[in-house]
Amino acid sequence: MYPAGPPAGPVPRRGRRPLPGPPAPAPAPVPAARPPPPAPGPRPRVAVKMAFRKAYSIKDKLQAIERVKGGERQASVCRDFGVPGGTLRGWLKDEPKLRWFLEQLGGEVGTQRKKMRLANEEEIDRAVYAWFLALRQHGVPLSGPLIQAQAEAFARQIYGPECTFKASHGWFWRWQKRHGISSQRFYGEAGPPAPSPAPGPPVKEEPALPSGAGPLPDRAPAPPPPAEGGYGDEQIYSASVTGLYWKLLPEQAAPPGAGDPGAGGCGRRWRGDRVTVLLAANLTGSHKLKPLVIGRLPDPPSLRHHNQDKFPASYRYSPDAWLSRPLLRGWFFEEFVPGVKRYLRRSCLQQKAVLLVAHPPCPSPAASMPALDSEDAPVRCRPEPLGPPEELQTPDGAVRVLFLSKGSSRAHIPAPLEQGVVAAFKQLYKRELLRLAVSCASGSPLDFMRSFMLKDMLYLAGLSWDLVQAGSIERCWLLGLRAAFEPRPGEDSAGQPAQAEEAAEHSRVLSDLTHLAALAYKCLAPEEVAEWLHLDDDGGPPEGCREEVGPALPPAAPPAPASLPSAMGGGEDEEEATDYGGTSVPTAGEAVRGLETALRWLENQDPREVGPLRLVQLRSLISMARRLGGIGHTPAGPYDGV
């Protein structure tokens, strides 16, 4: 192999043979290489104290920036905060970003943040936070579901109706943490408690309420709160009371001499057919409460086993079908106060409202007093006077009632809803009643009277109240205020332009009523239709016509021939059923039983989906089947018209 090193002697030239000479001396021995040092063993670990990384808040960063701007040396600032110089210079460079981030969050909440991280949907976040601050400045309490619903509404407004943004509980929690908002339970937001007044005389205990009235508050109501800016248009409500013959048709309202001779010359009219209706709405007409219907029946059969909360109108019982003091108090605390608070909360308004109530018109004793020898009859039919306004308000005084004055013609303040809204409601109700009567044209008016029940009346009352336009309610307030503050008779021409639209709507409804009455009754004059419309405008029936004092009686059925059976399932005619196409024709009793089964099933469905039209038509078919089959109508049956 090749030598490890260069040759010891001179290197011969190429191409020449080396000259002979003495042999070269042997090379000196190379000393052996030192063995490598042994590998060092594991060194003992020495504990080194590492500095913890600290995240500084935006407040600390801005304080360091202000100290540097104030002329302090950066070295001393770094020493105080425990940061290197590069970190401090990075803070100085990011000062505009820090200021902008605080503006986005708002308030002192953002100074505690350590990371500049905004929401994924910045526009929705800013809109919800601005809306939240605006409402809290007015003292409106807000809940989590309400804020989440408003966030989804803002998302649809910003990104369009196809936006899929969902304000979940996680989003709401992050929104709270981002803006430093905490959830608290409010038991009241009243001001400092007023000094307790001196003890007064004992208060007389209120009488027991009927089944339809609500409980009285446990404590005496507090004085009304001081007016902080007054009430807005949506916080001012008005209520009016009116009477209504709920199932009276034009044929039964014929003038004296034109009706049934056996009815005393004033047509068929029953005491149980008249009810009292309470209507309430705010000034703008944007919130209309459910009508309150007061009747003489304590437990109407048609309302049994039904959830009355689903009906568009409420029913209460009164012996004289009038709005008594306990009924008004129960309606105020059970329906008006909860409904108004829900509306104000949904509209993001302050939780306060006022209700203007006109004293119900008392019918004259000559018109409403029954012809009885008993001395307690006039007292029973006379409406009970309403209490003072101080007794009708919530314990905190936020929602209260003011009664309009009722004195001389000059000092009397008319109720706003009495300036055409109540009359429009009655006309719309009677138009829908005539439509139902015309739709049941297959039977006689007697069949319709038996098939139209109080449950259908509640549905028609709610439908008619919904048909009253909000603009009509708002304009009626202008008429009422003009009559209250300018009672001079020579200044009635100022409201003519505002009444043009009302007159057009009024004429259209009257035209519909006349047309429907002509379809239902061929020989009915327009004057008779007008008299039927204004029959229940006064406190009682017209002069010369007394209401029957006994219980509500169904109209007298036409006499049945002696050959017809008087009970269901009896008679020889039912046994002689003929065959038609191999199938026996059902008897009248079987047909009535089948229709009644279908009616019971239909009545247990949602009344908002079924509607009164189909129910009335089915009852009319049952009444017609009874009449054609000669089956007697049982007084205790479910089709007594109530």
Swiss-Prot record:
Question: Could you tell me which SUPFAM superfamilies the record lists for this protein?
Answer: Homeodomain-like
Listed Pro residues bias regions:
1-10, 19-43, 192-202, 218-227, 552-562
Indicate the segments forming the DDE-1 domain, all copies. 233-357, 410-477
Q: Does the keyword field hold DNA-binding? A: yes
Chain ranges of the HTH CENPB-type domain:
112-185
GO CC annotations, alphabetized:
nucleus
Give the family per the record. Answer: Belongs to the tigger transposable element derived protein family.
Q: What name does this protein carry?
A: Tigger transposable element-derived protein 5
Q: Which organism does this record belong to?
A: Homo sapiens (Human)
